[in-house]
Design a protein with these regions (language model features):
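Phosphate-binding beta-alpha-beta segment of Rossmann-like dinucleotide-binding domains, i.e.
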Residues: 4
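Inter-heme linker and motif-flanking segments adjacent to c-type heme-binding CXXCH motifs
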Residues: 12-260
Length: 260
């Protein structure tokens, strides 16, 4: 008689009441640990991994998770060439000593700060701009533990995932950036995922226009999301030198040391 895996191996994704392991689940490995750990260790007759370490989504995750037709991995990260592995690690890492659905990669794991203050090190995989990372964990870390940034500019709420975190004036991070696996900007331009940003600000991409929420001019302020100045505001464009005078590092933090 078939047995439901989750009847013995607890899965938080199926526990809508948040009750935790019950009955036959007590004392047994979690579903994620069991499934990812077992499949991640599988080898063929020659001893080669059936699911390649660090392989593409099509060769690994999509063998079980929703695949190409569902497009569960899309948005800015996918457009940038990042794979599931770059954020989550390989199957053995996912099936290791982490709490499923809780110990997840974070925005701050790759966006570790700004142009003047961000993580450095030979064990980090940097994007061409030298600021952002292309891997949410340190090279050589078999557990793929998400990096914690020392700079809080792009940091999630303490103890919270991105999808539950809030930023500017209590707004959900997802309200401006999109959902975790479909962060803006998304291609193609005319895509259902882009409807919200189109409706809110008239074009695709991260919701960045202050006039989306604010009906009045905000003037010369650096109190926007992540310490930004007013965007699309003629008053700031005309008088921004007043902000820059005496403290160009305020500008360099985002525009770079050369202010380009």
């Amino acid at each position: 008689q078939p047995v439901l895996c989750a009847s013995c191996h607890y899965s938080a994704a199926l526990d809508l009441e948040g009750a935790g392991p019950q009955g036959d689940q007590l004392g047994k490995p979690l579903m994620s640990e069991t499934m990812h750990g077992f499949h991640g260790a599988l080898t063929d007759a020659s001893g080669n991994n059936i699911f390649p370490r660090g392989g593409s989504a099509a060769d690994t995750c999509y063998q079980c998770h929703p695949g190409q037709n569902t497009e569960c991995h899309r948005g800015a990260m996918a457009d940038g060439g990042m794979e599931c592995f770059d954020c989550h690690g390989d199957m053995l890492a996912v099936g290791g000593n982490r709490t499923p659905w809780a110990d997840m990669p974070k925005c701050q794991s790759c966006h570790t700060g700004d142009a003047l203050n961000h993580l450095t090190g030979s064990d980090l995989k940097f994007a061409p701009d030298g600021i952002r990372l292309l891997q949410a964990w340190r090279n050589g870390d078999t557990t793929a533990t998400p990096i914690q940034a020392s700079n809080s500019r792009f940091k999630e709420d303490d103890g919270e995932l991105y999808r539950f975190s809030k930023g500017h004036e209590g707004m959900a991070c997802t309200a401006c950036h999109g959902s975790p696996h479909a962060t803006w900007p998304i291609t193609p331009e005319y895509n259902n995922d882009n409807v919200a940003s189109y409706e809110a600000q008239g074009h695709t991409g991260t919701i960045i226009e202050c006039s989306t929420c604010h009906t009045e001019s905000l003037g010369n302020t650096l109190e926007g999301p992540h310490g930004m100045h007013a965007v699309g505001n003629t008053s700031f464009v005309d008088d921004h030198e007043d902000v820059a005078d005496g403290n160009l590092d305020l500008c360099r933090s985002c525009h770079g040391a050369d202010l380009k």
